[in-house]
């Protein structure tokens, strides 16, 4: 029982941390600046996307998926960042402000949802480009409506997975230094199963993106230097693949350390978590660091699109512009007229 007579929820674990240590780790300025940088970056990307001319076909589908990714990153930073920044600024004791764990459960669901969505959307974008490049004439015409339907399916799938701990599979708990909630790296079967589902699904999404993007880039390079280059405009596809590879690299660098750490911790023998639910301080520090690295994915994603557009690449690398012009000159006259500027 808590001193005011309120019983504590199941999201609390023993976490030994002093107020001075928490002040040193949980800097309100760092949290606020980090959140503001991410929100500003995603708002800038959304404004650029709003002014883009999607046209029709593969580009409209790709831009719709990209818009869904940036929108998801923006909402993720807005929801989770607001909770963490407020906890850091006020140095609140989670047990006093949320003894029933409702806010903790909400944040846990949000962390899983907004963590998996970018990885799943990256895999969906890689699949769309793989089919578009390797089999351009053997699929239905890509449309932005179908792309938004894909975004909706990803949101539903990630949301359903995030709700599993509320249905009894796994647990969400307050994490060191007491300002955020995430899945529990415990020894209970439900914790292990849910944690492995999250880590394996995220890793599989990254692996699928790597495989499909590698094949797509190889196919694009082969077609670029063959007769087929005179039959299909390559400049737009090159731009989309450069952006997609950048998104994949960012996701791999930011998320794989955390996903691998979760799997290693859950499968480690002897278990890292004690019977009382306490983690080793070194493990808590590592989890916090890997989580902060993973959060950079939401900040860097929009900059991949902003910096890797054709207009920017032409300014930074004139040779890229000359290569695109050479490809355009190699198109048949009728196709060049239909393709437009």
Curated annotation (Swiss-Prot):
Glycans are attached at residues 4, 16. Disulfide bonds join 104-181. It is a multi-pass membrane protein. Its main location: membrane. Residues 53-65, 128-147, 218-244, 310-341 are cytoplasmic. GO terms for cellular component: acrosomal vesicle; nuclear speck; plasma membrane. GO terms for molecular function: thromboxane receptor activity. The chain crosses the membrane at residues 30-52, 66-86, 106-127, 148-170, 192-217, 245-268, 288-309. It is found in: Cell membrane. The modification Phosphoserine is found at residue 328. Residues 1-29, 87-105, 171-191, 269-287 are extracellular. One of its GO terms (biological process) is positive regulation of blood pressure. It comes from the Eukaryota. Keywords: Cell membrane, Disulfide bond, G-protein coupled receptor, Glycoprotein, Membrane, Phosphoprotein, Receptor, Transducer, Transmembrane, Transmembrane helix. Receptor for thromboxane A2 (TXA2), a potent stimulator of platelet aggregation. The activity of this receptor is mediated by a G-protein that activates a phosphatidylinositol-calcium second messenger system. In the kidney, the binding of TXA2 to glomerular TP receptors causes intense vasoconstriction. Activates phospholipase C and adenylyl cyclase. Belongs to the G-protein coupled receptor 1 family. Interacts with RPGRIP1L. Interacts with RACK1; the interaction regulates TBXA2R cell surface expression. This is Thromboxane A2 receptor. It comes from Mus musculus. The gene is Tbxa2r.
């Amino acid at each position: 029982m808590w001193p005011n007579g309120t019983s504590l929820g199941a999201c609390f674990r023993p976490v030994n941390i002093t107020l001075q240590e928490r002040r040193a780790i949980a800097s309100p300025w760092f949290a606020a600046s980090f959140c503001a940088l991410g929100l500003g970056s995603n708002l800038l990307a959304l404004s650029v996307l709003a002014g883009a001319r999607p046209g029709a076909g593969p580009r409209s589908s790709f831009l719709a998926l990209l818009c869904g990714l940036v929108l998801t990153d923006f909402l993720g930073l807005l929801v989770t960042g607001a909770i963490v920044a407020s906890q850091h600024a006020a140095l609140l004791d989670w047990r006093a402000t949320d003894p029933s764990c409702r806010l903790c459960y909400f944040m846990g669901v949000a962390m899983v949802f907004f963590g998996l969505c970018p990885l799943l959307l990256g895999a969906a974008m890689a699949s769309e480009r793989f089919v578009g490049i390797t089999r351009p004439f053997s699929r239905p015409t890509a449309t932005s409506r179908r792309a938004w339907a894909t975004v909706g399916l990803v949101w539903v799938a990630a949301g359903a997975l995030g709700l599993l701990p509320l249905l009894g599979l796994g647990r969400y708990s307050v994490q060191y230094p007491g300002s955020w909630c995430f899945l529990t790296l415990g020894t209970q079967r439900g914790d292990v199963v849910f944690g492995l589902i999250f880590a394996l699904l995220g890793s599989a999404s990254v692996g699928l993106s790597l495989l499909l993007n590698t094949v797509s880039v190889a196919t694009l390079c082969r077609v670029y230097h063959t007769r087929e280059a005179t039959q299909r405009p390559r400049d737009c596809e090159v731009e989309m693949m450069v952006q997609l590879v950048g998104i994949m690299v960012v996701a791999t660098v930011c998320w794989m350390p955390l996903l691998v750490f979760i799997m290693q911790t859950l499968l480690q023998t002897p278990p890292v978590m004690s019977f009382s639910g306490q983690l080793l301080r070194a493990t808590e520090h590592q989890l916090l660091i890997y989580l902060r690295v993973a959060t950079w994915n939401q900040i860097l994603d929009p900059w991949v699109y902003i910096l890797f557009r054709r207009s920017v690449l032409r300014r930074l690398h004139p040779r890229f512009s000359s290569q695109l012009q050479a490809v355009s000159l190699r198109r048949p006259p009728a196709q060049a007229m239909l393709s437009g500027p």
